[in-house]
């Protein structure tokens, strides 16, 4: 009996490991989203224009995923997304430079020929001017005065000539 159980257990283990794709698709099993590389979208690529400097391209696109030491004129951006165990989607774009200026774009994205119109997210709020009868200081000092008018008492100014006459 022991001699037949061991080969059956080994055969069952080998058979189950071959069913990895079946085990990945079991209902109720959570699979994480896997994103790798530079996140690239069409809005970023639409901002690229010929003769842009490398610094401007870095500001728009971020650091390239690959900079080949043998092809310094070429920057490669790769993005891979595999949401929840589904099929992997990979996008790439290569930018070509002549010296410091952008001369070409190649890959899954193409810049549009329309100018980029950026919608403003700023809003202006008009706050109406408040009509204050009294300042805070006038209100505080008005609590201690006997005057019903609420005005602050004014100290008469003494002139230097008045001091000499005394």
UniProtKB/Swiss-Prot annotation:
GO terms for cellular component: Bam protein complex. A lipid is attached at residue 19 (S-diacylglycerol cysteine). It is found in: Cell outer membrane. Residues 1-18 form the signal peptide. A lipid is attached at residue 19 (N-palmitoyl cysteine). GO terms for molecular function: protein-macromolecule adaptor activity. It is a lipid-anchor. Pfam families: BamE. PROSITE patterns: PROKAR_LIPOPROTEIN (PS51257). Residues 143-166 are annotated as: Disordered. GO terms for biological process: Gram-negative-bacterium-type cell outer membrane assembly; protein insertion into membrane. Keywords: Cell outer membrane, Lipoprotein, Membrane, Palmitate, Signal. Part of the outer membrane protein assembly complex, which is involved in assembly and insertion of beta-barrel proteins into the outer membrane. Part of the Bam complex. Belongs to the BamE family. This is Outer membrane protein assembly factor BamE. It comes from Methylomonas methanica (strain DSM 25384 / MC09).
